[in-house]
Amino acid sequence: MPAVTVENPLTLPRVAAPAEAVARPVLTVTTAPSGFEGEGFPVRRAFAGINYRHLDPFIMMDQMGEVEYAPGEPKGTPWHPHRGFETVTYIIDGIFDHQDSNGGGGTITNGDTQWMTAGSGLLHIEAPPEALVMSGGLFHGLQLWVNLPAKDKMMAPRYQDIRGGNVQLLTSPDGGALLRVIAGELDGHQGPGITHTPISMIHATLAPGAEITLPWREDFNGLAYVLAGRGSVGAERRAIHTGQTAVFGDGGSLTVRADEKQDSHTPDLEVVLLGGQPIREPMAHYGPFVMNTRDELQQAFDDFQKGRLGTIPAVHGMTPEGGI
């Protein structure tokens, strides 16, 4: 169950369905393959098999868990580099420590988001705190990679610490859905995330049988990924369930519904909605680097091998730039 919730959604601002917007059709629904990341924690590759023209400016997204760790089981990632894009780590339940070679770092937990702009490059590490390793416990989150346009790929690294209590909370007209706006704008309400590439990121919880039709910028793409539960998407009511991604076509609104009966282990439909303005530039992606050309990729690897992306360990405990 997501950590950020409210007892009575009807106390929140309500998002009404747009009166005359063209409904976005569902182009495809894909199923995320499972794998392992870092030191061996389980992930689902949410965007596997989706053509990049439907994802742009998003690059990849991994759902981490949901998993109940036994003592000694929690795992993270070792120190590794990034350049040319942003990582967005959203912890739905659980806790994670992180540190980077630019002096940023801290702990994110229960609805918090770490928004890291790698820009010209840095090193970072993500790991469960020692207390979680010793005791075990619930862990569930996701990590999204967002591309940067060529003009911003070599900008100075930046870090934002977005606390769960600061996300914009909204609801549907009947209170059947809780909408957490992490970044971007929805019906005049702004999320706290500062984005270099215009995007929207929303975590929606729909009660059984609930439906939402949201206004959606026509210059954005549209994606819906199911974290847990069962439902349908689009006017055509295309079925969708845990670990699946729906790709929407053009239009001014998108619709998600929760089935009346949910899986026994999850009471609601949990879905992440993403939209972004396509960058429409060449992309060269290999491992932890996302650039525009192969030469730029080679330069990134050379800079990393020569220590130009930072040193380990970084000074920890500094106030991160852009904390929210």
PLM features per residue range, with description:
Residues 1-324:
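Jelly-roll (double-stranded beta-helix
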